[in-house]
Amino acid sequence: MDKVGKMWNNFKYRCQNLFGHEGGSRSENVDMNSNRCLSVKKKNISLGDSAPQQQSSPLRENVALQLGLSPSKNSSRRNQNCAAEIPQIVEISIEKDNDSCVTPGTRLARRDSYSRHAPWGGKKKHSCSTKTQSSLDTDKKFGRTRSGLQRRERRYGVSSVHDMDSVSSRTVGSRSLRQRLQDTVGLCFPMRTYSKQSKPLFSNKRKIHLSELMLEKCPFPAGSDLAQKWHLIKQHTAPVSPHSTFFDTFDPSLVSTEDEEDRLRERRRLSIEEGVDPPPNAQIHTFEATAQVNPLYKLGPKLAPGMTEVNGDSCAVPQANCDSEEDTTTLCLQSRRQKQRQVSGDSHAHVSRQGAWKVHTQIDYIHCLVPDLLQITGNPCYWGVMDRYEAEALLEGKPEGTFLLRDSAQEDYLFSVSFRRYNRSLHARIEQWNHNFSFDAHDPCVFHSSTVTGLLEHYKDPSSCMFFEPLLTISLNRTFPFSLQYICRAVICRCTTYDGIDGLPLPSMLQDFLKEYHYKQKVRVRWLEREPVKAK
């Protein structure tokens, strides 16, 4: 008995160091089970007949008795040292206490916790026999099927001050055990901690009704994200047409600068697609185009490059012979160079067999001569016909802001500027829309002028030039004079119009020479007919 007492004291000391506050409340259970084990060893009492009586006792006593004492059928188990069974008794009692203290939501996490896979738990479970494990499983099933009232009394019922102290000690002990396990596991199996204060009291998200988006004034509180993005919301919900009621009732003082710029860009985009109103007494030039349009393309006033184009009611001509002036310089049809429009007859027939559409489009536009061609010809910075590579060779090594004016290499544009900025040579083409010249016709906020020379004069001032715009402060003068023929053309174009050149008593070649520097302004687009092409 002295040897058993020493072993028990050693085991009790280790359990107190391991479980902290849980040792005081659970040592009583171990003492009770050890005393019963010793008394049964002396009296050699068999528990085979007392099994029905154990069902009426508490679940903890059943587990302790069945694990502390094995059946009497095996004589070797009857004389076995009961101190070897004490660790299993303590482990099972810990699990039962935890099951009775924690909530049902945390019971599953407890089964998967680190205590089930601890080294001491695995070794001491092997010391139990198969019969002991089976009896433990039956007791667990029996405990789950008990009535809810008894479980509630066992978990939450407090009959005396002693029971209250034991419940509080279990709570503190379980908390300390959780901290110990979390320190042991570390980052491998982090345990999530829930805090009620971390959750927001209310959510910032709210449902937005469609009627709120159609209001003229912002219904959201000032300073919120929706109030700051109100101009973007109205940009996608309000109509863009200038004839809508939104523009009539809208207060410009409530709109930011960015919103106004976006609205102007959208209005310019619509005017480019639809055309502008022609001036009074202007001669309208009609251009009818019949195109085999692939269904992949969008059917609109701007036809994609590579489509068949026909003037008037004439028959279709081969793509390689499309050299007329009407075909090569029309902006609205986006006709590029002849090599970009060449399509083989086989591919054209293949597109027709796939169910293409035959579109008849009538495009109305007016021809206008460059208003200040005489001033441009007399300007020393104008070099005439020149490509970008020749311009870069002339500007190499020149200071910041050096520029020259030249003819654009693209057929859809008349002039371009080459200039030095950021230690390199850059190029910008001069675009035209509605009889105004600028470096970006699609953006109405960019500076525009009715003449090309007026545009160059504006960008000579560095203070009025943005970082992404051309800087034209120092002109690179040309080293040769223009011929008398060029100068005479500039003088004649100043005194007449594009349509007035046809009334001059000049040969057709000279008339074409006088019409060279002109641009086309689209004024109206009408869809005449759209019918599917019959498959051949």
Swiss-Prot record:
Pathway: Protein modification; protein ubiquitination. Residues 381-476 form the SH2 domain. Residues 115-175 are annotated as: Disordered. InterPro entries: SH2 (IPR000980), SH2_dom_sf (IPR036860), SOCS4/SOCS5_dom (IPR022252), SOCS5_SOCS (IPR037343), SOCS_box (IPR001496), SOCS_box-like_dom_sf (IPR036036). GO terms for biological process: cell surface receptor signaling pathway via JAK-STAT; cytokine-mediated signaling pathway; epidermal growth factor receptor signaling pathway; intracellular signal transduction; negative regulation of epidermal growth factor-activated receptor activity; positive regulation of proteasomal ubiquitin-dependent protein catabolic process; protein ubiquitination. Residues 158-169 have a biased composition (Low complexity). It comes from the Eukaryota. Keywords: Growth regulation, SH2 domain, Signal transduction inhibitor, Ubl conjugation pathway. Phosphorylated. Phosphorylation is induced by EGF. Residues 471-520 form the SOCS box domain. Residues 1-50 are annotated as: Required for interaction with IL4R. The SOCS box domain mediates the interaction with the Elongin BC complex, an adapter module in different E3 ubiquitin ligase complexes. SOCS family proteins form part of a classical negative feedback system that regulates cytokine signal transduction. May be a substrate-recognition component of a SCF-like ECS (Elongin BC-CUL2/5-SOCS-box protein) E3 ubiquitin-protein ligase complex which mediates the ubiquitination and subsequent proteasomal degradation of target proteins. Inhibits for instance EGF signaling by mediating the degradation of the EGF receptor/EGFR. Involved in the regulation of T-helper cell differentiation by inhibiting of the IL4 signaling pathway which promotes differentiation into the Th2 phenotype. Interacts with EGFR. Interacts with ELOB and ELOC; mediates EGFR ubiquitination and degradation. Interacts with IL4R; inhibits IL4 signaling. This is Suppressor of cytokine signaling 5. It comes from Bos taurus (Bovine). The lineage of its organism: Eukaryota, Metazoa, Chordata, Craniata, Vertebrata.
